[in-house]
Regions:
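N-terminal strand-loop element at the rim of the active site
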Residues: 16-18, 36-81
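A conserved mid-protein helix/loop that constitutes part of the nucleotide-sugar donor-binding site
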Residues: 28-32, 212, 216-235, 252-255
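Glycosyltransferase donor-sugar binding loop
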Residues: 49-52, 217, 241-258, 272-274
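Membrane-proximal helix-turn-helix segments that form the acceptor-binding/catalytic region
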Residues: 147-166
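Short alpha-helical donor nucleotide-sugar binding micro-motif in glycosyltransferases
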Residues: 275-276, 283-288
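Aromatic "clamp/platform" in nucleotide-sugar-dependent glycosyltransferases that forms part
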Residues: 296
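Short hydrophobic beta-strand element within catalytic cores of glycosyltransferases
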Residues: 313-317
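A charged, aromatic-enriched C-terminal amphipathic alpha-helix characteristic of glycosyltransferases
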Residues: 354-388
Length: 388
């Protein structure tokens, strides 16, 4: 199937997009989706003029005008007169806007405002919302009062009956059903696309001498649970390097993590590398022996997939969609209420590596590639974006 006169025009509203990278998963969700589907669907991406947490806009892009990029186009809206520019954009594209896709539920600028404008000025357009894990228990409890008000507002304006939901996990499907008291007909559960790893990555070995290299690559916030990882690593009795990558979301939390880092034994080295461009993520994972992410809540986990694509095992909490990993030989998913299980798992893994137990990056990468069948995903997404 290629583009035709029936090809849907899909307007994607997302606060962060390429060339940004600091927001992590949400950017990769959309950029991978566009990459795999641009032969079949006309995408028009509406995004902000800067990366997450930065006060300056991108220098390398023109603002407030459509920029053609391969088979799709992007507009970076400046903060000055944002509301006016957004209204003008929607009105100018009324005839073209057949499908609207929102890459968040709570975003005031790139979901709530355009959703209200579209309800007033657009007729017969399909509205799709991708909450990206925002309804899971660990995420819904943050800023609960403000979120409850918007949920009331959302229901009062009758949006519930006119929205299609896109989720990537059964847990979020279930959360949406319970929260809005709807059936499954308006919910599409479709996994995210992944990238393809370079074959040279598969040739990298494990361990650096007798040192275990552990990596944490995620936003630094209580939800991602870096402090828990540090508390486990502080108890390891063998040479360890713990590489931390990610944007600091919560400065107070990071200060607490730094206190934990300062108390590490001499044989444990902790290095904070800052945020990382998505282009280098697979290489970073392949340079480490295990990805440690004891997250309190995860909807999909792009970093988890990318670690597996690089052939690096993952040590996760049981709060992600990726379960029973040890039975496939690609990692572990463990309960957060048991520090000892995490500690013993790292000890056993290190012992296996030291004793020469064979671990194949290629086999790990093949496992995740088999789990994510891109052609099936393409067909599912075409159905999601169809105008019927």
């Amino acid at each position: 199937m290629e583009k035709s006169s029936y090809t849907p025009n899909v307007f994607i509203f997302t606060r962060y997009y390429l060339p940004g990278f600091r927001a992590g998963g949400p950017i990769r969700s959309i950029s991978n989706l566009v990459y795999h589907l641009e032969r079949y669907i006309d995408f028009h991406i509406v995004t902000s003029d800067r990366d997450m947490g930065l006060s300056r806009h991108y220098n390398e892009v023109c603002l407030d005008t459509w920029i053609r990029n391969s088979e799709n186009e992007v507009i970076y809206l400046s903060r000055l007169f944002f509301g006016f520019n957004l209204l003008s954009l929607i009105l100018r594209n009324r005839k073209k806007s057949k499908v609207l896709y929102f890459n968040s539920f709570w975003d005031p600028m790139f979901t709530i405002l355009p959703l209200i404008i579209s309800k007033i000025f657009l007729n017969n357009c399909k509205v799709i919302i991708a909450p990206r894990g925002e309804f899971l228990d660990g995420a819904l409890g943050v800023k609960r009062l403000k979120k409850n008000f918007y949920l009331w507002f959302f229901r009062s304006l009758g949006f519930v009956n006119n929205v299609v939901w896109h989720t990537t996990s059964y847990d979020e499907c279930d959360a949406i059903r319970k929260l809005f008291k709807i059936d499954s007909n308006s919910i599409f559960q479709i996994s995210n696309f992944s990238r393809i790893a370079d074959k040279d990555i598969m040739k990298k070995g494990f361990l650096s001498g007798d040192t275990l290299r552990i990596v944490f690559l995620s936003r630094i916030s209580p939800k991602k649970n870096l402090a828990f990882a540090l508390s486990i690593i502080s108890r390891l009795e063998f040479p360890t390097i713990f590489n931390i990558y990610g944007v600091i979301d919560d400065v107070e939390y990071w200060n607490y993590c730094q206190k934990l880092i300062s108390q590490m034994n001499n044989h444990v080295i902790v290095i904070y590398h800052g945020s990382v461009d998505n282009r280098f993520v697979l290489d970073i994972f392949s340079d480490n022996d295990v990805f440690f992410l004891p997250t309190k809540s995860e909807n999909f986990g792009h970093a988890i997939v990318e670690s597996l694509l690089a052939g690096t095992p993952v040590l996760l909490s049981d709060k992600t969609p990726w379960r029973n990993l040890s039975s496939f030989g690609v990692g572990w998913d463990l309960p957060l209420n048991s520090d000892e299980v995490f500690l013993s798992t790292l000890n056993s893994y290190y012992s296996d590596l030291i004793n020469g137990v064979s671990i194949s990056r290629y086999n790990i990468s093949q496992w995740i590639n088999n789990r994510i069948n891109h052609q099936y995903l393409i067909n599912d997404y075409i159905m999601l974006f169809s105008q019927n």
